[in-house]
Amino acid sequence: MDFDNLLNLEEQYYQEGFLEGQNENIKQSFLEGKQYGLQVGFQRFTLLGQMEGLCDVIESYGLHSPTLEKNIHTIRTLMKGLKMNNDDESVMEFERVLIKLKNKFRTILITLHRLVKDKRTPTVTFEVFEDVSRAIAGEIRGFVENEDIAKNKTKQNQAQSW
């Protein structure tokens, strides 16, 4: 009989536990990375979607301002050129274009305010627009079929069920 395996039994269980913990950590890290990526992507493109929507609304007013139309066209052109990739070059390009988009959108809001000239309504500034965007992007919730069950789940459990 060979009793050498019995002497190494503790080491064997230690190694099995270590490998099991390592594999579980890899799964959890992947899940956290996926959640973070979804959140960042949602936050970035929420602002662009709101800009696009407000450009549609402003165009529907029919104000016929050449400056306004030119800036809206510029915003739409810049948005069409954005790539949805996640490599370093695309992210840097996105950040560069986002700065241009924000500045053009500020110009649109200022022009719109001058054209409307209604003193009774509060001015829509870009800061107000960004606050609305942050409020929307901060309310990220996953889709759940049964609301009662969702209230009892922690965010981690809900994310794992995605």
Curated annotation (Swiss-Prot):
Listed GO CC annotations: cytoplasm; nucleus; Yae1-Lto1 complex
This protein's UniProt keywords: Nucleus
Outcome reported for the amino acid change (mutating R134G): Lethal at 37 degrees Celsius
Matches recorded under InterPro entries: Essential_protein_Yae1_N (IPR019191), LTO1_adapter (IPR052436)
Compartments it resides in: Nucleus
One Pfam entry name: Yae1_N
Stretches for region deca-GX3 motif: 17-53
Effect of substituting E147G: Lethal at 37 degrees Celsius
Impact after mutating L101S: Lethal at 37 degrees Celsius
This protein's record includes keyword Nucleus: yes
This protein's record includes keyword Nucleus: yes
Record GO biological process: protein maturation
UniProt main location, coarse: nucleus
Annotated consequence of substituting W162A: Abolishes interaction with the CIA complex. No effect on interaction with YAE1. Strongly decreases iron incorporation into RLI1
Additional remark text: Present with 784 molecules/cell in log phase SD medium.
Family label: Belongs to the LTO1 family.
Subunit annotation: Forms a complex with YAE1; the complex bridges the interaction between the CIA complex and RLI1. Associates with the CIA complex (via its C-terminal tryptophan).
Function field: Essential for life in oxygen, but nonessential under anaerobic conditions. Required for biogenesis of the large ribosomal subunit and initiation of translation in oxygen. The complex LTO1:YAE1 functions as a target specific adapter that recruits apo-RLI1 to the cytosolic iron-sulfur protein assembly (CIA) complex machinery.
Annotated protein name in UniProt: Protein LTO1
Organism: Saccharomyces cerevisiae (strain ATCC 204508 / S288c)
Classification lineage: Eukaryota, Fungi, Dikarya, Ascomycota, Saccharomycotina
Gene behind the chain: LTO1
